[in-house]
């Protein structure tokens, strides 16, 4: 792809992703990187440099979704089983386009997406968010992501055909599976150490894998420089994940003092995926939308999340935004930020959770904030998310989307004038 042309964005309000707010700033970029941030009054017009006037808008870093399953949109097993793979891939690509159009410039896919769509974005064939992939969820037999039912029929709806099956048992198989996923292109490793809301066999807090198995996965991933994300709602499975040294904990269930102390001490990221339960509870109004066992678990777990979130937040656990939303309507992923605020974060904290803190969770040190040297991932929104966080979930109010210095959405029109 050609190198992005230089550009300057005039900002009504600039939120840098690190907790700072500045009025009437200007952000300059070239070669896909931010080169300068200064007051608009100090900017001099340079020939050949495009200027975008977002002087009435709020500019902030591109948003992250640290936990999604882009290959598993909310369609029934029956419908998915009758869908040609090529059509399914095109639907996934459309979901990715929609996410970028609504301000999400980076997504960490926690199982299902294959290497092809990631490369399509990198090569410019698909206008989607930057993607980090785990390919599959490492799971034990009869565990969270074992899609084989009691009669041997696969109910797999998560993975694209190019993503491996992550079922394995024992230390040696766990180590081998980690290596296979890395060989297949995984940016990070995802392991399930407890059951989940969608588990057919296990409960939400059922321990999955032994400590030795989890340690084998983490050690092997570290040898290849890959972080490990653990699906872990609580109990002994969560403790095993933390003892093994995972980089992040996905989802949120009951937390005790030991869990929180380990997360704070080790710097473990928590990706609570509050929206996942919210969406499931909303789907309860649609007959047959979800299995009864899944709805029962969601209803039991939902009231526990508020207390757990409050304790983790107050203790200083690093919380990153992720939805586990599986292809919501455009703008829907940003509802996670509204829930973070509802559960106790300030709007600025929620924005950091979806920008700079999320970048840390994704191990992308050169993204997530608006500073010289960082990747030029920015969005502009019509409104003030510090006053009304829900504005980020309104697709019609996302006026500008820039990823790596390239403009993928611009409803502003016109250039800024009045430069010195």
Predicted regions and their residues:
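Divalent metal-dependent hydrolysis catalytic cores, especially in the metallo-beta-lactamase
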Residues: 91-117, 128-137, 163, 186-199, ...
């Amino acid at each position: 792809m050609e190198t992005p042309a230089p550009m300057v964005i005039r900002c009504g309000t600039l939120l840098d992703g690190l907790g700072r707010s500045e009025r009437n700033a200007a952000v300059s970029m070239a070669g896909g990187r931010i080169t300068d941030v200064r007051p608009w009054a100090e900017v001099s017009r340079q020939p050949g440099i495009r200027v975008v006037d977002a002087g009435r808008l709020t500019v902030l870093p591109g948003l992250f979704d640290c936990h999604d399953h882009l290959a598993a949109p909310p369609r029934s097993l029956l419908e998915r089983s009758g869908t040609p793979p090529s059509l399914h891939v095109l639907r996934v690509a459309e979901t990715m386009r929609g996410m970028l159009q609504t301000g999400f410039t980076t997504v960490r896919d926690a199982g299902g997406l294959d290497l092809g769509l990631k490369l399509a974005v990198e090569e410019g064939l698909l206008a989607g968010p930057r993607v980090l992939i785990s390919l599959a969820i490492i799971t034990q037999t009869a565990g969270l992501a074992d899609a084989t039912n009691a009669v041997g029929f696969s109910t797999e709806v998560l993975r694209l055909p190019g993503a491996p099956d992550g079922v394995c048992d024992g230390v040696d198989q766990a180590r081998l599976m980690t290596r296979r996923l890395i060989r297949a292109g995984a940016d990070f490793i995802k392991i399930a150490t407890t059951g989940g809301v969608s588990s057919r066999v296990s409960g939400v807090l059922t321990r999955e894998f032994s400590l030795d198995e989890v340690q084998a996965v983490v050690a092997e991933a570290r040898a290849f420089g890959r972080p490990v994300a653990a699906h872990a709602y609580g109990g002994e499975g969560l403790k095993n994940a933390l003892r093994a040294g995972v980089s992040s904990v996905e989802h949120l269930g009951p937390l005790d003092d030991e869990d929180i102390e380990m997360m704070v001490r080790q710097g473990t990221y928590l990706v609570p995926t509050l929206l996942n339960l919210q969406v499931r509870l909303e789907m309860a109004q649609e007959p047959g939308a979800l299995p009864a066992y899944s709805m029962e678990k969601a209803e039991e777990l939902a009231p526990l999340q508020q207390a757990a979130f409050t304790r983790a937040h107050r203790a200083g656990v690093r919380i990153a935004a992720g939805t586990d939303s599986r292809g919501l309507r455009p703008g829907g992923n940003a509802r996670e930020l509204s829930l973070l605020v509802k559960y106790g974060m300030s709007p600025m904290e929620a924005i950091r959770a979806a920008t700079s803190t999320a970048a840390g969770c994704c191990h992308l040190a050169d993204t997530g904030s608006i500073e010289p040297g960082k990747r030029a991932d920015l969005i502009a929104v019509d409104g003030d998310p510090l006053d009304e966080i829900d504005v980020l979930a309104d697709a019609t109010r996302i006026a500008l989307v820039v990823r790596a210095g390239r403009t993928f959405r611009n409803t502003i029109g016109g250039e800024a004038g009045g430069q010195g």
